[in-house]
């Protein structure tokens, strides 16, 4: 076998801009390492977007106006879910009503599919993403939207983001798919109130604080109901795996090979909760900590297993990990490329480093390629205006810091 030295960084992206064929080592059904020929999906150039109508985007970021439509939105989505088969994007590909690891059998390459990662209450990033989608999509071929979950928690406008997604669903259910994130799955309603098994969980606190408000409570219950049956993974016909987190870790592979049960609760959980290690070859499965990670050989093993089971996977798009540039393509995963994309325009309170203003990303599906990353260069002053309170907490201005120091001296 010929050894291949794979480039890294920008050189890696340049080298992988066209698909290539490589001989790789991968395990066969018996676990024996054997050579395979793998065609590596290409990696399209990143697109920088700075020419949206930012004034129009700003006008759409109106939480009060979104709430005025809340009752109508909630009632319409409740009615849609009451029909048992709401007809969301890819629902027709489910093996049965309970299938949450959907094998998509056909996808028109000429009909655009946009993938939107973690939002965490970022109404500004959502409206910017929708503005780009609407601008770059022909009216004759409406865009399809795939959300990677995590709509709330970490401040921002969690309720309003959720309501806007509800609106998108009721307006055109066949063009919207929600892949559940860990914060979405963690939200539950017990009858006595809302709970969450994740931290931070400020959205469940918000819902409980507003239990006397009928429509906020019904919106929360509706979210729980929607997420309960929404997919955890999509297997696209070109080999792209779409998840929030990752894939079933290696300790589940033997049982999955024997059963073929993609909807095993442990598999569904791993699709949602696992994290990518950017450089490790392998990681021991560890679901008892936040760092339930996988490495690039773990993903290669999963790709081999999925092919055995009739669902070939060659590359993956995911959210979950809040990477520095809001997207990352990991050089270590060159044989089976992985894209992490996050749609955040501001630094979250739990993220201690870097500028407050971020560049959210979304991605456009392209057959036999990693989805193409689009970086939305939201004006910094707009981010600071919309999230003024969060910015004040993250970066108190110099005069306030000086005032605090003077006060400390006066009371010393």
Can you say where each PLM-predicted feature lies in the sequence?
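Active-site-proximal loop/helix segment associated with metal-binding centers of metalloenzymes
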Residues: 27, 31-77, 82, 197-219, ...
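Active-site neighborhood of phospho(di)ester-bond hydrolases with catalytic His/Asp-centered motifs
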Residues: 115-117, 144-149, 177-182, 242-243, ...
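N-terminal active-site segment of His-dependent metallophosphoesterases
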Residues: 40-160, 164
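Active-site environment of divalent metal-dependent phosphoester hydrolases
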Residues: 120-124, 153-156, 183-189, 235, ...
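Active-site neighborhood of divalent metal-dependent phosphoester bond hydrolases
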Residues: 111-112, 140-144, 151-241, 248
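Binuclear metal-dependent phosphoesterase catalytic core
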Residues: 334-412
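Short coil/turn segments at secondary-structure boundaries
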Residues: 127-131, 158-163, 190-194, 254-256, ...
């Amino acid at each position: 076998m010929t050894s291949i030295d794979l480039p890294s960084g920008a050189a890696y992206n340049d080298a992988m801009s066209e698909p290539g064929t490589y001989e790789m080592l991968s395990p066969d059904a018996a676990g024996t390492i054997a050579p395979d020929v793998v065609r590596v999906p290409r990696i399209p150039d990143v697109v920088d977007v700075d020419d949206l109508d930012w004034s129009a985007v700003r006008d759409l970021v109106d939480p009060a106006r979104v709430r005025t439509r809340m009752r109508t939105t909630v009632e319409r989505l409740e009615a849609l879910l009451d029909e048992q088969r709401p007809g969301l994007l890819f629902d027709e590909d489910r093996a049965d009503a309970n299938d949450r690891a959907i094998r998509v059998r056909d996808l028109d390459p000429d009909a655009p599919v946009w993938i939107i990662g973690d939002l965490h209450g970022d109404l500004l990033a959502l409206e910017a993403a929708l503005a780009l989608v609407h601008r770059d999509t022909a009216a004759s071929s409406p865009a399809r939207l795939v959300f990677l979950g995590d709509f709330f928690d970490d401040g921002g406008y969690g309720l309003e983001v959720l309501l806007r997604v509800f609106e998108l669903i009721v307006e055109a259910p066949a063009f919207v798919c929600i892949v559940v994130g860990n914060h979405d799955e963690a939200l539950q309603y017990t009858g006595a109130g809302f709970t969450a098994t994740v931290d931070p969980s400020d959205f469940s606190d918000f819902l409980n604080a507003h239990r006397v408000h009928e429509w906020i409570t019904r919106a929360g219950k509706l979210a729980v109901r929607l997420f309960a049956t929404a997919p955890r993974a999509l297997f696209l016909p070109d080999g792209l795996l779409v998840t929030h987190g990752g894939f079933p870790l290696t300790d589940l592979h033997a049982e999955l090979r024997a059963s073929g049960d993609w909807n095993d609760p442990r598999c569904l959980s791993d699709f949602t909760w696992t994290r990518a290690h950017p450089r490790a070859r392998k990681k021991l499965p560890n679901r008892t900590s936040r760092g339930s990670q996988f490495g690039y050989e773990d993903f290669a093993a999963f790709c081999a297993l999925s092919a055995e089971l009739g669902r070939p996977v060659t590359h993956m798009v995911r959210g979950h990990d809040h990477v520095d540039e809001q997207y990352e393509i990991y050089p270590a995963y060159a044989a089976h490329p992985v894209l992490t994309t996050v749609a955040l325009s501001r630094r979250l309170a739990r993220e201690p480093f870097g500028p407050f203003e971020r560049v959210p990303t979304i991605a456009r599906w392209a057959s036999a390629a990693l989805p193409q990353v689009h970086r939305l260069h939201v004006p910094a002053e707009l981010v600071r205006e919309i999230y003024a309170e969060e910015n004040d907490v993250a970066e108190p201005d110099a005069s306030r810091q000086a005032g605090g120091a003077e006060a400390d001296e006066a009371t010393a």
